[in-house]
C-alpha cells in the first residue's frame, strides 16, 4: 500500500528555517534569464532581427537597466508594459510574516518568481521605451509574444532550453549567467 502524501499546508515550519532573501536572490537571476530568453525569442519573429541587432539591444538595455533600478522607474516601467500589452502585472510587496507552513512557503516562492519575472520584463520594456530602441507598435508585439511564450513554457509546450537552442541555431546567440550576472555571447560566424 502506498504512503499517503502529506498536505504541505499542514507541515509547520519554523520562522528561522528559511531565508527569504536567499530565496529571492536565487530566483531573481533565473527570472532575469527567463525574461531575456522570452524577449529575444519574441524578437526572432521579426525578419530584421540579426545577431548584431540583438547585441545592440542587449547592450543598450543593460546600460540603461543599471540606472533604472529604483522603485519609481520600476513602477513607471510596469505601467508602460501594461499599456503596450494589456497584461495586468501584480506588483505587491511580498511579506514573510504569513509563512507558517510549507504550503505558505511554496506560495511565497511562486509569487516571488512571478514578481521577479514581471519586474525583469518591465525593466527591459522600460529601457526599450526610454531609449526608443523599438517603435511602440513593435515593442507591443514583442512583449505580447514574450508573454505568450511564457504561457507556453508554463504549459510545458516549449522549454526555455528550446528558446535558447533556437537563438543559438538561428542567430549564434548564447545567454548565460556568471555569478548572478547575465551575459550574452555572439558566436563568430564560421
Model-inferred region functions:
Residues 3-42, 70-130, 160-190:
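Intrinsic disorder/low-complexity detector
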Residues 57-68, 142-153:
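Amphipathic alpha-helical segments that form the core helices of the histone-fold
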Residues 129-130, 139-144:
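A structural feature that tracks compact, well-ordered secondary-structure segments
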